[in-house]
Swiss-Prot record:
Residues 42-52 have a biased composition (Low complexity). Its EC number is 2.1.1.17. HAMAP family: PEMT. Keywords: Endoplasmic reticulum, Lipid biosynthesis, Lipid metabolism, Membrane, Methyltransferase, Phospholipid biosynthesis, Phospholipid metabolism, S-adenosyl-L-methionine, Transferase, Transmembrane, Transmembrane helix. Residues 1-58 are annotated as: Disordered. GO terms for molecular function: phosphatidylethanolamine N-methyltransferase activity. Pathway: Phospholipid metabolism; phosphatidylcholine biosynthesis. It catalyses: a 1,2-diacyl-sn-glycero-3-phosphoethanolamine + S-adenosyl-L-methionine = a 1,2-diacyl-sn-glycero-3-phospho-N-methylethanolamine + S-adenosyl-L-homocysteine + H(+). GO terms for cellular component: cortical endoplasmic reticulum; endoplasmic reticulum membrane; perinuclear endoplasmic reticulum. Catalyzes the first step of the methylation pathway of phosphatidylcholine biosynthesis, the SAM-dependent methylation of phosphatidylethanolamine (PE) to phosphatidylmonomethylethanolamine (PMME). This is Phosphatidylethanolamine N-methyltransferase. GO terms for biological process: methylation; phosphatidylcholine biosynthetic process. PROSITE patterns: SAM_CHO2.
């Protein structure tokens, strides 16, 4: 079921249609709403009909077909409600469910647990893997609809084109029985009919998944020996409550999203309706997959079985994987595509203060250090995350060395009470410093800009103050967590008997709380970025802005409780008084920091724009009965008065307490070009006989590279006869430029023939291709393969060879174009191979050609004349960047000053292409985030020029620059 709750919206909780999609039905075509005039009863009836028509939901297929979306019912009602019509598929589902129940009753007791564990895991795999694969190929290639069209499932037998009329009649009866209004099987779009068939498969899988889980819980359920009756009653009461809560979540979610999102309808078509996400969608992100699985844990408590608990956790994790891998990418692609590229850059762009922290940092540095260059790009080098570790930076080096020292001491010191006390006190000291020490610094920064003033006093910039603060905060956070983990390690004693008492449960709950804190941290960082993570609005408050997306949609301060969940989880796992004390101190310090440091600053910066209540709070208050609401308002008033008194007291006492306190990678992804060449035994296709490879041919056209490789091949180091170039020259094409392949074959060639692009060194055999194409292929004929991306490569459809080129055998030809992801984004020598009938038998191989990035020629450009040099770099870089961005007008700029499209930030492949090209052209290596941060060819050219200027004194290349050593610098040479 689709859970698209975390989508951008123009209002609270509104789900947007894809930008650029016009309203499906014009307003003048829809019946108007009835007015308030007194008309006859017939007029009122017409108005009611008009209103009913206007309330219909309209859908649109990818080809633009508009249709009325009929009303459907949920699967439980369809299967179990006797008032709902039943059909053959219902009988199949109910029969399979009955077989599950019979198996649970008749199987021997010794086999029940293992059998139903495998049965449930099978249906869970059908759900998360089976449905996941179907939805993935439908989202990327619309393959389910393609299969339905190819198999002619919905083709009327009256046309004579349906090879299986019985299946058509069966589907027609099945679907029309279920949908009584606004639906005609023959007139419905193929996308909608395919979705209805897909729904029946989903019904079977979901019902079997749920029933098999319940049966597994039943066969595993028991009452622990010697259980206290009060504990048993509490266990069942909590379990039933969780099941009831789970049931309410599912029902309320279905009320909001209806069957369209419940059954992933937006993978097939879109509807002309803004879905208001209220109710349960204000409680938690993706409620059907998060809190919607609370019932699993309720059933586990009632069964009193760790087997049920562990299989519930496994199923829940599989559901989250399904969400991340299948649903989220589709939701992002469908409802939140990158914004269109600005066609012209703003003339006043250089005068606008950047809004993000990196731009602010660069802007402050420019004001204090280089005010003459307003267009200087901002630096890009994040701190948080393993992929951002750079040992050339002091903070990163420190957060590797210091935790290593702590780890060594943890392992080599004995487990004595003295050492345990030392480690606990060490962790407590870092905790107090992290919350209280850094908090006091931020408080002074908020009130007097103390931190920034300190660096300005010594001639540094505000940007440098910000960078130093980030380093201090990062080191303190890492050491705080490292010291706490070390203390937990010292205080933890592995249990001798895992089955004793609540030992296992404590470990499971503790691990769950740790996972909750990690998820909270990732969500907070994803929402705030490094600017918010390091409290950037304490340093650059004039450009700070609020965000209420992701986890902040539901909670105002997720760190207040969820941010310390892992500490309490560690206390449960260790079951140590010292760690419990640490958790309590952490909770108090966190609340203190939020209440007396963060909140006053937020109120000062944002004022009335601060949201008073989060989504979860609003939902809970709306759900309270009136008497409870009145009591809650009274309690709120008492709490407000108490809080005001405490704040006044602290304001009075603070000066006394404060007296005497002193304030204090190049990307390493490997390029897996191919699978290793391996010995292949090839079966020649039976229909290959009679196909003469000489009749097949390929010719390649592309954008010739401006550079030449002749100077590299003939350098004077060869013998005299080897210095003369051959008459036949290998074609050299631009890096990333589209390649057009013209193919020619006999008229009787297989429609499943295809053309692949390979490196010349990939294959040892000229008759058989030994390595996969890795997506770099195109069919010769359309409509043969299921892949949506295959047919788009066909530039010219198959057609007979012109009469002027007629031969003894009838020949046909066509053209395919390789661009974007179908190219090799590296330099080398390549070839195209024409393959027979969907196999890897090569009937023709093109002439080898080279893909080459021309080196930037600095001979005619004076590096010292920076303006001219930047213009030359811009001119050389623009066509290369356009190629790297697939020459897509929505992504690639037309002029150096124009910004890149939003896809560059979404997909790192574009940035990786560009930095590779820059490295080969200029010998300068940038990290991929630099491209997205700069956002234009002009800023990239400035960055290249600046890097060249910095590295010029160390360059070994020929140069006419001012840094070339003069002879007077070497007195010994004069003698």
């Amino acid at each position: 079921m689709s859970t698209a709750a975390d989508l951008p919206s123009t209002g609270p909780g509104l789900r947007l249609r894809q930008p650029g999609v016009e309203p499906l039905v014009d307003q003048d075509k829809l019946p108007s709403q009835p007015g308030h005039s007194r008309e006859s009863s017939d007029a009122n009836a017409d108005a009611n009909v008009s209103s009913d028509k206007a309330s219909k939901t309209y859908g649109r297929t990818p080809d633009g077909t508009v249709f009325i979306v009929p009303t459907t019912h949920d699967m439980v009602s369809q299967l179990l409600d006797p008032r709902q019509p039943k059909n053959f598929s219902d009988a199949i589902v109910l029969t399979i469910l009955g077989l599950h129940i019979l198996a649970a009753y008749f199987l021997p007791s010794s086999y029940k647990r293992i059998v139903f564990a495998f049965v449930f895991l099978f249906w869970r795999a059908c759900y998360n893997i089976g449905i996941g694969v179907l939805l993935q190929i439908q989202s990327n290639h619309r393959r389910l609809v393609t299969w339905a069209r190819r198999w002619k499932l919905f083709e009327n037998p009256a046309t004579g084109k349906n090879p299986r009329p019985w299946l058509y009649n069966l589907l027609k009866n099945e679907l029309e029985t279920k949908i009584e209004e606004d639906y005609e099987f023959e007139k419905a779009p193929i996308e909608y009919n395919t979705w209805l068939v897909f729904r029946r498969v989903v019904d079977l899988i979901l019902m079997c998944d749920f029933v098999s889980y319940c049966l597994f819980a039943i066969v595993c359920g028991h009452s622990p020996e010697g259980e206290n009756p009060l504990i048993g009653f509490s266990r069942w009461a909590i379990g039933i409550s969780l099941i009831g809560f789970n049931l309410w979540v599912k029902l309320d979610a279905h009320r909001v999203v209806k069957d369209f999102a419940w059954y992933w309808g937006d993978f097939f078509y879109l509807i002309d309706q803004d879905l208001t996400f209220d109710g349960v969608f204000e409680m938690a992100p993706h409620p059907m997959y998060s809190i919607g699985y609370a019932g699993y844990y309720g059933i586990s408590m009632m069964a009193a079985s760790y087997e049920v608990l562990f299989i519930s956790i496994l199923a829940h994790l599989a559901q989250f994987a399904f969400l991340v891998i299948v649903e989220n990418p589709h939701i992002e692609k469908t409802y939140n595509p990158p914004p269109p590229r600005k066609r012209t850059a703003s003339e006043s762009q250089g005068d606008v203060v950047p809004a993000d922290v990196k731009s602010l940092e660069g802007a402050f540095d420019q004001q204090t250090l280089a005010p003459t260059h307003k267009e200087s790009p901002a630096p890009v080098h994040n701190l948080v995350g393993l992929n951002n570790i750079d040992l050339f930076r002091v903070p990163d080096f420190t957060v590797i060395v210091l935790p290593s020292y702590v780890a060594v001491l943890t392992f080599v010191t004995p487990e004595t009470p003295v050492w345990q006390a030392i480690f606990v006190l060490h962790a407590l000291a870092w905790r107090v410093w992290y919350h209280l020490g850094l908090g006091l610094i931020l408080d002074k920064q908020s009130k007097t800009k103390m931190w920034t003033r300190h660096f300005l006093k010594f001639g540094e910039s505000a940007g440098e103050a910000w960078r130093q603060w980030k380093g201090l905060h990062h080191i303190s956070m890492i050491m705080c967590n490292t010291a706490f983990i070390a203390a937990c390690w010292k205080m933890y004693s592995p249990p001798e008997d895992w089955a004793y008492g609540l030992v296992m449960l404590k470990h499971v709950l503790g691990a769950g709380l740790v996972a909750l804190q990690l998820w909270t941290a990732f969500s907070v960082y994803d929402s705030l970025g490094e600017f918010g993570w390091f409290c950037g609005d304490f340093f650059f408050d004039q450009q700070a802005k609020l965000t209420y997306k992701s986890i902040y949609r539901f909670l105002n301060n997720p760190d207040r409780f969820f941010g310390t969940a892992g500490v309490w989880g560690a206390a449960l796992i260790t079951w140590s008084r010292s760690i419990f004390l640490m958790a309590l101190v952490t909770q108090i310090l966190t609340v203190f920091y939020i209440s007396y440091i963060e909140r006053p600053h937020m109120q000062k910066i944002y004022g009335r724009s601060l949201r008073r209540e989060a989504g979860l709070t609003k939902f809970i208050k709306r759900s309270l009965p009136p008497p409870v609401k009145g009591w809650q308002e009274s309690v709120d008033k008492v709490l407000d008065d108490t809080t005001q008194f405490v704040e006044d007291f602290l304001d009075t006492a603070r000066p006394k307490f404060a007296a005497g306190v002193k304030t204090i990678v190049r990307d390493t992804s490997a390029l897996f070009n191919m699978a290793p060449a391996r010995l292949t035994i090839t079966r020649i296709a039976p229909d290959l006989q009679g196909h003469d490879p000489k009749l097949y041919s390929l010719s390649v056209q592309g954008t010739p590279s401006m550079g030449t490789s002749i100077d590299d091949k003939f350098t004077g180091k060869e013998s005299l006869t080897g210095r003369f170039p051959k008459q036949i020259k290998t074609m050299i094409y631009e890096y990333g430029a589209p390649l057009r392949v013209k193919w020619r074959a006999p008229a009787g060639h297989s429609k499943k023939d295809w053309i692949g692009l390979y490196m010349v060194t990939d294959n040892r055999s000229r008759e058989t291709t030994e390595v996969p194409s890795l997506g770099r292929w195109a069919p010769t004929n359309a409509g043969v393969y299921d892949s949506l991306t295959a047919d788009v490569s066909i530039a010219v459809e198959e057609h007979p060879v012109s009469t002027t080129e007629a031969t003894e055998i009838d020949m046909v030809e066509g053209e395919v174009e390789f661009r974007g992801d179908k190219l090799w984004w590296t330099q080398g020598v390549f070839e195209f191979r024409y393959h027979h009938d969907g196999h890897h038998t090569a009937l023709s191989i093109s002439e080898p050609f080279e893909i080459r990035i021309s080196k930037f020629d600095e001979e005619d450009v004076d590096v010292g004349a920076k303006g001219l040099y930047e213009q030359a770099v811009e001119s050389a870089l623009l066509p290369v960047v356009q190629n790297c961005l697939d020459r897509d007008p929505d992504i690639a700029p037309n002029q150096p000053e124009e910004p890149f499209g939003g896809h560059v930030e979404r997909d790192t492949k574009y940035a990786k292409r560009i930095v590779y090209a820059i490295r080969e052209m200029f010998g300068i290596e940038f990290a991929p985030p630099v491209v997205a941060a700069d956002g234009s060819v002009r800023k990239l050219a400035w960055r290249v020029s600046n890097a060249k200027e910095v590295l010029a004194p160390y360059s070994m290349s020929r140069s006419r620059g001012t840094t070339t050593p003069a002879i007077q610098d070497f007195p010994a040479e004069k003698a």
